[in-house]
Regions:
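Contiguous hydrophobic, helix-prone segments at protein termini
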Residues: 2-414
């Protein structure tokens, strides 16, 4: 195994690179996980994403070499930033129905010059089916694994509602209760990523089906685990309400929600309703230290203001057969969106719980700023190490150093 960084620039949480799978790209995950991420996020979310890839590998016939790489580094970390393992992703796409190896290469490399995805040769295929035979095996395994996915997702959504605690309720909990809750929420987040991974497999099977109707629908690799259109759709809906009113657009761009409400109470109410639904969502929503729309509703308002001048054109109605296949694709996306949204909902529950714990650490003079709790790992937040301040300082300095650098979008061993 080799380090990606040179000249002593390797981060504490960096992965090592197997020279048989040497190419990694941040292109397909940078929007949702725009690092450098905090240690807490790296600990909780990256382990959750790896739980998802391990579940996905159950439906593949990858062989031992690819299975190990897929489970450990399908999504890797370098300089506190997530990178997709392009070499492994391409091999997976060759097996999974509805996945496109060409799109994986195109979106991941985005014009970057890479000499070879497999400079040591493609991994041996011993014990691994190829081509259509592999895809047939995958479909059979997927249907068996997906049999309970809908019921499990519904139960997961119900748990998110049942286990929600307000800020006031969190304040009333003991330290021990908060510690138990942190463990529970970490497990819930991992459960959500596993469900999202299953629905990504389902999306691929659906994509392979609708391609028969001439619709170009593909899964463009494991980075699609982090793809969500919910914020864009909500923003576009709100932008449509303001599209023809320059005054409202100007107020939105100025983040003046009171001004928008005074000028149009109905639009103000629409924004309030959107924030109540989407308060757990926001820019870089998988990063635990980030603010969400519920913390700062003006972020959603400003996004809608920016979108109001660039509304999409109406789509020409399709024929009945195309509509049927479009509904199939839409239903597959909706299931994955629901699993993803609920994972983000549990992420926000953990975010709020960690904020409360950080405030208590600050009151006890165990840390200097409440937000420093995000520079601990999950286990360290539950059982605070004696050298917590030193760890936090070292990790904060390291993250700030990475923030000042411009890491490459594509990493490969030379």
């Amino acid at each position: 195994m080799s380090a990606a960084a040179r000249d002593g620039q390797e981060g504490e949480f960096d992965d090592r690179i197997d020279p048989r799978f040497p190419v990694f790209s941040a292109a397909t995950v940078a929007e949702t996980l725009p690092g450098p991420l905090t240690p807490m996020t790296l600990d909780v979310q990256l382990s959750g994403l790896r739980a998802a890839t391990r579940v996905m590998s159950l439906v593949m016939a990858p062989g031992d070499v690819l299975a190990d790489e897929w489970g450990m580094r399908a999504i890797a970390v370098f300089s506190h930033r997530p990178y997709v393992g392009v070499s492994a992703d391409v091999l997976a796409a060759e097996q999974l129905p509805g996945w496109s190896a060409d799109e994986v290469r195109c979106l991941s490399l985005d014009g970057s010059h890479v000499d070879a995805l497999f400079p040591l040769g493609r991994p041996p295929s011993t014990g691994r089916l190829l081509g259509s035979a592999a895809k047939a095996v995958v479909v059979k395994r997927a249907f068996a694994l997906l049999r309970r996915a809908k019921a499990d997702t519904q139960a997961y959504v119900a748990a998110a509602t049942a286990e929600h605690l307000s800020a006031a309720q969190l304040m009333s909990k003991s330290d021990a209760e908060l510690q138990v809750r942190i463990r529970l929420l970490r497990d819930r987040i991992h459960q959500g990523w596993r469900l999202t991974g299953l629905w990504l497999i389902d999306s691929g099977i659906t994509a392979a089906t609708v391609q028969r109707a001439g619709l170009h629908v593909t899964v463009s690799g494991v980075g699609a685990l982090l793809r969500s259109d919910a914020i864009e759709a909500e923003t576009a809906s709100l932008a449509g309400l303001m599209q023809n009113d320059d005054r409202l657009c100007a107020l939105a761009l100025d983040r003046d929600l009171d001004g928008v409400t005074a000028l149009s109470p109905s639009i103000g109410a629409a924004f309030a309703s959107a924030v109540s639904r989407m308060g757990h969502r926001g820019p870089g929503e998988v990063e635990l230290a980030n603010l969400m729309f519920g913390d700062d509703p003006a972020m959603l308002l400003a996004a809608a203001g920016r979108a109001a001048s660039d509304m999409p054109q109406p789509v020409k109605p399709a024929g009945s057969e195309a509509k049927l296949y479009e509904r199939m694709a839409s239903n597959a996306r909706a299931s994955r969106e629901l699993a993803y949204d609920t994972t983000v909902r549990f992420t926000h529950e953990l975010r709020m719980t960690l904020r409360e714990l950080g405030s208590r650490f600050l009151d006890a003079e165990l840390i200097d700023v409440a937000g420093e709790v995000f520079y601990l790992t999950c286990d360290e937040a539950i059982t605070l190490p004696s050298d917590a301040r030193l760890r936090i300082k070292r990790r904060r300095d390291e993250r700030e150093r990475f923030q000042s650098l411009r890491p490459p979008d594509v990493i490969t061993l030379s």
